[in-house]
């Protein structure tokens, strides 16, 4: 079928070897992209591709265009990955995919921690990390065809972690992973989606103003209140949604007060007292642990061992948590009651620590309500 020279028999611009690729495509579940009957008289069910995409350069299932390659075309690959997933051994390292505004961009990847980089774009970009979305150059208008220049999509089955925007005002949207999103210059609109997401800035925290805003969103006939943030620096204002971490040049800010950030400061208050709950280094260590998958219970246990050592005396445990909660020495009756529960195995020191961390008094001690408005700095 192929002697390596490409000088092989053809008919109607079809190399005979392409017939096998075409028929293998059918066997794998691909259909014709056009409405006209095949030579056997069969008509593919809709939807169909536009004429500009009904070409062999985009799909081997087309009858149009000269077929010069012995491999599936971009739309074939996207459809097959939707059906069967991505080959995990291909592009399995930490790969950087550079956005090309002169060509279409079909992103597919087998593994690793990967990045889409649009920093060299001469125009703003609108890019989504979730598979199947239609990204494009510009902010408000996309080409009708995903195969047009500057269009970008992540194929189904591919997970991309990081995204770098252009030097203009971009719209960047993450996926369900823990994303790192870099808007670069301009006034960007950034939405992290699910996961613990980080936005990186190229200026110091002291040079930025953080303003929380309330937005109203309609969903299933109901109106939801959504919190967003504006990060103002110089003449640029970034609007961010569903972002848990802000990384400045000199420090970081955690915004998820109802998530891991809130858990850490409550844990530190229970273990070390309210004054130490804002220790930036301790907060950073705790966030790294929880964001990496460590449970709150395991972190509380580790923290208690750090403060009191392994297998601490039950009375010392009660005294520690009571004083950090109330601010005074525990009464003997309290010490007796809870130390006996610990000694009898009916209450663990970790359980007591969690109860103290989640107590309303702890929330008041660390001004948890106020932290919702400012975020929590850490290093």
List each language-model region with its residue ranges.
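Short, solvent-exposed loop/turn segments at the edges of secondary structure
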Residues: 1, 53-58, 75, 158, ...
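Glycine- and aspartate-rich repeat motifs characteristic of hemolysin/RTX-like Ca2+-binding segments
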Residues: 1-13, 64-200, 205-209, 225-232, ...
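A well-ordered secondary-structure block
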Residues: 4-6, 10, 14-20, 339-343, ...
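Short, polar/flexible loop-turn hinges at active-site or ligand-entry regions and domain interfaces
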Residues: 5-11, 34-39, 43, 67-70, ...
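The catalytic-center signature of Zn2+-dependent metalloproteases
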Residues: 14-75
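Short, composition-biased motifs enriched in small/polar/acidic residues
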Residues: 210-218
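Substrate/cofactor-recognition hotspot
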Residues: 244-379
């Amino acid at each position: 079928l192929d002697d390596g020279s490409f000088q092989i028999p053809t008919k109607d611009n079809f190399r005979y070897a392409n017939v096998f690729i075409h028929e293998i495509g059918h066997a794998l579940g691909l259909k014709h992209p056009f409405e006209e009957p095949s030579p056997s008289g069969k008509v593919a069910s809709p939807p169909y591709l536009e004429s500009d995409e009904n070409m062999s350069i985009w799909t081997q299932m087309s009858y149009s265009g000269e077929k010069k390659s012995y491999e599936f075309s971009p739309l074939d690959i996207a459809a097959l990955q939707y059906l069967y997933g991505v080959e995990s051994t291909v592009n399995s390292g930490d790969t950087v995919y550079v956005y090309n505004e002169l060509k279409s961009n079909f992103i597919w990847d087998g593994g690793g921690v990967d990045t889409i980089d649009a920093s060299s774009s001469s125009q703003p970009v609108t890019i989504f990390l979730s598979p199947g979305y239609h990204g494009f150059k510009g902010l408000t208008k996309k080409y009708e065809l995903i195969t047009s220049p500057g269009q970008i999509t992540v194929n189904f089955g591919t997970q991309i972690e990081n995204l770098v925007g252009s030097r203009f005002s971009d719209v960047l949207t993450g996926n369900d992973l823990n994303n790192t999103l870099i808007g670069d210059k301009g006034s960007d609109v950034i939405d992290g989606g699910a996961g613990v997401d980080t936005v990186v800035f190229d200026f110091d925290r002291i040079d930025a103003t953080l303003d929380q805003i309330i937005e109203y969103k309609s969903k299933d006939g109901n109106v939801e209140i959504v919190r967003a943030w504006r990060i103002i620096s110089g003449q640029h204002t970034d609007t961010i949604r569903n972002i848990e971490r802000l990384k400045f040049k000199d420090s970081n800010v955690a915004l998820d007060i109802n998530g891991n950030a809130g858990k850490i400061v409550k844990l530190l208050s229970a273990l070390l007292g309210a004054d130490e709950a804002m220790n930036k280094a301790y907060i950073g260590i705790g966030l790294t642990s929880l964001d990496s998958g460590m449970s709150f219970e395991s972190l509380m246990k580790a923290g208690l061992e750090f403060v009191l050592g392994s297998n601490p005396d039950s009375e010392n445990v009660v005294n520690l948590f009571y004083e950090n909660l109330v601010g005074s020495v525990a009464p003997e009756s309290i010490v007796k009651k809870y130390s006996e529960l610990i000694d009898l195995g009916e209450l663990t020191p970790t359980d007591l620590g969690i109860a103290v961390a989640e107590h309303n008094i702890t929330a008041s001690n660390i001004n948890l309500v106020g932290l919702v408005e400012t975020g929590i700095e850490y290093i």
